[in-house]
Design a protein with these regions (language model features):
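Conserved SAM/SAH cofactor-binding pocket of Class I
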Residues: 2-86, 96
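Short glycine-rich anion-binding loops that position phosphate/pyrophosphate groups of nucleotides
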Residues: 25, 88-91, 123
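Conserved beta-strand segments of alpha/beta enzyme cores
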Residues: 41, 66-68, 114, 133-136
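Non-DNA-binding regulatory cores of transcription-related proteins
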Residues: 72, 99, 121-124
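A short, conserved alpha-helix within the catalytic core of class I
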Residues: 92-101
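Conserved beta-strand signature within the Rossmann-like core of class I S-adenosyl-L-methionine
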Residues: 107-122
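Active-site capping/gating segments
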Residues: 120-158
Length: 158
């Protein structure tokens, strides 16, 4: 769960901000972020029905009215969002291709609208291939657990 909350150490979401969690799996990072930012609106998207069923149950059990789980491939979405969050779904160039057109320009939080992505390892080459300017935040700056040693939040504005 701390891994998911590292995003909140980088960016706080404003009231009414629309956040898309791509490949949400069991609800990370969208569930912890929806708890932390009750005035923001989260869409948790995954193409696997079983995973979305879990997120639906968790959201209902926690009373998260600001979280909407959707069983969908993100490439087919037509809605636009202020921020896109995700956790190691695919290579960054492919990910950016999927979601860039879904991002609204503007600023609905402490950073301009954009992508906040959780990923580990050496990302320099992968990020360069996107053609975007990225800001890399090492998670050990926020949390001292050994698990986070190579983990990062990477951000690029729309």
């Amino acid at each position: 769960m701390l891994h998911s909350l590292a995003i909140a150490k980088v960016c706080t979401f404003g009231d009414g901000a629309r956040i898309l969690d791509v490949g949400c799996g069991g609800g990370f990072p969208s569930v912890p972020l929806a708890i932390l930012f009750p005035e923001a609106r989260f869409t948790a998207a995954d193409s696997i029905r079983k995973k979305i069923t879990v997120v639906e149950g968790v959201a209902a059990g926690l009373g998260l009215t600001n979280l909407t789980p959707r069983c969908v491939r993100v490439e087919t979405l037509t809605e636009r969002f202020d921020y896109v969050v995700s956790r190691a779904v695919t290579a960054m160039p492919e990910f950016v291709g999927w979601i860039w057109s879904r991002l609204e320009k503007g600023q609905k939080g402490s950073l301009p609208n954009g992508i906040l992505y959780l990923k580990g390892g050496d990302l320099a080459e992968e990020l360069a291939l996107t053609g975007k300017r990225w800001h890399v935040y090492d998670i050990p700056r926020f949390f001292g657990e050994e698990f986070f040693e190579t983990k990062k939040v990477v951000y690029t504005p729309r």
